[in-house]
């Protein structure tokens, strides 16, 4: 843990954690949003996420040039800000009747930010340690990615599940009595058959 006394090391690991928090949490939600809200098949939903991968690839490969021109700190900070803007666009434009193109714009913006953040942050982790500690740097880099990803899925999944639960209770309250009864009966069937194979 002594490595975290180095501000450069700590800032870089924090940036990686935040990027992978957003990345994995978003992936988790993207696939469900495209399939369950817009009705795309799993394959079709996966293809609709390809703009994210292309934008990430493009920006990640250009990040070294950006660091040379503007400096590592400015590029990483800008990348995190762009990632947040992309996430904000997705939050504001992802609804039942929203066009796929708004979603595509949001994921591209988010991916551009993630791409320019990841490589410089990884480089900063590795450069902040002595050469004989490169294995430690690599392990911490991988661990922070996994930690960020796991937290992203857990937190974003919990937020969506909570919102869904609250929305369903409000929707059921305004539904005709027959609809409310059928939901109760469906729940009973699910409980009874849940353990059977």
Can you name each region flagged by the protein language model?
Residues 123-124, 140, 144-197:
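Hydrophobic transmembrane architecture of multi-pass small-molecule transporters
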Residues 1-132, 136:
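Transmembrane core module of solute transporters
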């Amino acid at each position: 843990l002594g490595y975290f006394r180095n501000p450069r090391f700590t800032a870089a690991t924090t940036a990686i954690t935040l990027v992978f928090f957003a990345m994995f949490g978003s992936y988790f939600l993207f696939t469900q949003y495209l399939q369950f809200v817009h009705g795309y098949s799993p394959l079709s939903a996966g293809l609709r996420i390809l703009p994210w991968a292309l934008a990430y690839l493009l920006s990640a490969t250009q990040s070294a040039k950006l660091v040379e021109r503007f400096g590592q700190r400015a590029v990483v900070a800008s990348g995190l800000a762009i990632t947040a803007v992309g996430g904000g666009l997705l939050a504001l434009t992802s609804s039942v009747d929203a066009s796929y193109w708004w979603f595509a714009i949001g994921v591209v913006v988010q991916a551009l930010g993630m791409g320019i953040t990841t490589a410089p942050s990884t480089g900063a982790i590795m450069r902040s340690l002595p050469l004989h500690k490169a294995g430690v740097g690599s392990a911490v880099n991988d661990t922070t990615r996994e930690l960020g990803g796991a937290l992203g899925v857990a937190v974003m999944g919990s937020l969506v599940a909570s919102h869904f639960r609250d929305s369903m209770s409000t929707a059921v309250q305004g539904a005709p009595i027959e609809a409310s009864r059928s939901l109760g009966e469906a729940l009973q069937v699910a409980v009874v058959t849940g353990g059977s194979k």
